[in-house]
Amino acid sequence: MPHHYILTLFGLLPVATNISTWWNFGSMLLTCLMLQVLTGFFLAVHYTANINLAFSSIIHITRDVPYGWLMQNLHAIGASMFFICIYIHIARGLYYGSHLNKETWMSGITLLITLIATAFFGYVLPGGQMSFRAATGITNLLTAVPYLGATMTTWLWGGFAINDPTLTRFFALHFILPFAIISLSSLHIILLHEEGSSNPLGTNPDIDKIPFHPYHSYKDLLLLTLMLLTLMITVSFFPDIFNDPDNFSKANPLVTPQHIKPEWYFLFAYGILRSIPNKLGGALALVMSIMILLTAPLTHTAHLRPMTFRPLSQLMFWTLISTFITITWAATKPVEPPYIIISQTTATLYFTFFISTPILGWIENKMMNSC
């Protein structure tokens, strides 16, 4: 056991004995964050935030910089791994009732919003065709804001179109926001351990606890090893698996792709945006697709904390997961039948989960009371 008092406190942290592998994703997210900051720093050393040179600087990093290809692929695929872990982390929180720890949940959603902003700014930086179009399309949504929209968009772009000032400020934001994420993560962990984590049964964990180290630390280490192994296999053998073919071409404002397709981890929100044939309505739906997670602690009406013994909520939860996957897939397709109706149906089902949660809680309470 380490002798430094902070490390000793961390090692002796009391944790419920019955938390499963689903509780490992917090430490995996911390590892992803460290990896992103390290690889991002080495990429920033060689990157040029200039509209004419950005694409060339990425090629230079990949071809000429020693292990530049590794840094670039680790950073790009590491971002996908980050989002896989965070989506599983959120799903686990919804399933096992972790959202009832309100302060921790709210800080977590703030973290998610900051992470999405950071990833979006990073996606624009390579200066590829799809990066340019995604930046133009998404930032242009600000014009839907009444009265202030056009001014806000011009201010964000630093001009009347995406150009050098846009890339410079996006690079600055992409560089600084990870430090905000680190600070928010510290706050998230402090708030979590003030009350303690939940467990699969939703019972009071104070009855039976064990030290975090060595029991849970070694359990975390197993999944961490598997995650890093998966990451290295993907980087080594399938480095372009998440890349869009259009992004291998330098940004050309005179050429428009068939349809805008952001990175896969934005597609569920983009699919919801695209399913509404109105600019302001779509922009509001896009924001609500994330912000509606904040309502989860307020709409929990069931007597039981987790969904472990709540069959109706389980059915709705797995509908949400399948909806999330379907809307992600539909958002990769052109805006034409049948993808339009699929997007609209799945967008409706996505919001239905959060609206139906309190009703299902009341029904399940009645069912339990009648037994």
UniProtKB/Swiss-Prot annotation:
Localization: Mitochondrion inner membrane
Transmembrane segments: 25-45, 69-90, 105-125, 170-190, 218-238, 280-300, 312-332, 339-358
Membrane topology: Multi-pass membrane protein
UniProt-listed PROSITE patterns: CYTB_CTER, CYTB_NTER
Molecular functions per Gene Ontology: metal ion binding; ubiquinol-cytochrome-c reductase activity
The keyword Nucleotide-binding is annotated on this UniProt entry: no
GO CC terms in record: mitochondrial inner membrane; respiratory chain complex III
Record note on cofactor: Binds 2 heme b groups non-covalently.
Cofactor: heme b
A GO BP entry: mitochondrial electron transport, ubiquinol to cytochrome c
Binding site for heme b b562: H75, H174
Binding, heme b b566: H89, H188
Keyword terms: Electron transport, Heme, Iron, Membrane, Metal-binding, Mitochondrion, Mitochondrion inner membrane, Respiratory chain, Transmembrane, Transmembrane helix, Transport, Ubiquinone
Keyword Lipid metabolism listed: no
Binding site for a ubiquinone: H193
Quaternary data: The cytochrome bc1 complex contains 3 respiratory subunits (MT-CYB, CYC1 and UQCRFS1), 2 core proteins (UQCRC1 and UQCRC2) and probably 6 low-molecular weight proteins.
Family of the protein in this entry: Belongs to the cytochrome b family.
PANTHER family, per the entry: CYTOCHROME B
Extra remark: Heme 1 (or BL or b562) is low-potential and absorbs at about 562 nm, and heme 2 (or BH or b566) is high-potential and absorbs at about 566 nm.
Function: Component of the ubiquinol-cytochrome c reductase complex (complex III or cytochrome b-c1 complex) that is part of the mitochondrial respiratory chain. The b-c1 complex mediates electron transfer from ubiquinol to cytochrome c. Contributes to the generation of a proton gradient across the mitochondrial membrane that is then used for ATP synthesis.
Name of this chain's protein: Cytochrome b
Protein source organism: Python regius
